[in-house]
Amino acid sequence: MKRIKKIIVNVTSVNLAAIDADAIVVPEFQHCALHSGIGITIAKTYPEGMQKYDYYAKAAGSSLGSVVVTETGSATCKHLLHAVILGCCREDLFACVKIAVEKALVLADENGALFVAIPTLGTGVAGYLSVEQSAKAVFAAVAEFAPFAKNIRRIDFAVSVSSVKVVEDILQQESYLDCETEIDGKKFGEWIYTLCNQLNSGVPEVSC
């Protein structure tokens, strides 16, 4: 746990959907992303918020690094903040996550959130970042946002149990500061992303 300006930042292994936050940042879920990881949890817990995002994405489209806010219909977590990072190239993903998280925090703050939960971003089957790199991007975004926060007073960063200590060390040692970009955390994200697209397009064969 660490205080950054007025915001308490906490590293937790609690399931993202079980965190009693006012708003939750989620990666944009498309294609096969909903069939694994936090995609299933969020879709089951906040189906209204996911359905609203699907409608918006089909009607208006979205650009990398942007964030879309949807209402969940829940009495506890009122908003999902959908960070559009899926499909970002390896070289730009760290910066894309950082930009999207900062935008998400601004939007959550504008909507009156006091408590925001954020998962690791860019680390899934279609991502390139390691958990450590994702943590640096998220914490860097929090540090840039914190001086301007009007409402947000707590941020929980949700990671796996095995990653808590290494991520907590990054937070305490402030190794995320002045970190502009990091690449090559994972090598297979591009192939997985291509596979997902081909499966959804009905292409029967995938070479690797």
Model regions and ranges:
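Glycine-/small-residue-enriched capping loops at alpha/beta junctions
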Residues: 1-111
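Phosphate/ribose-phosphate-bearing ligand recognition and processing surfaces
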Residues: 86-206
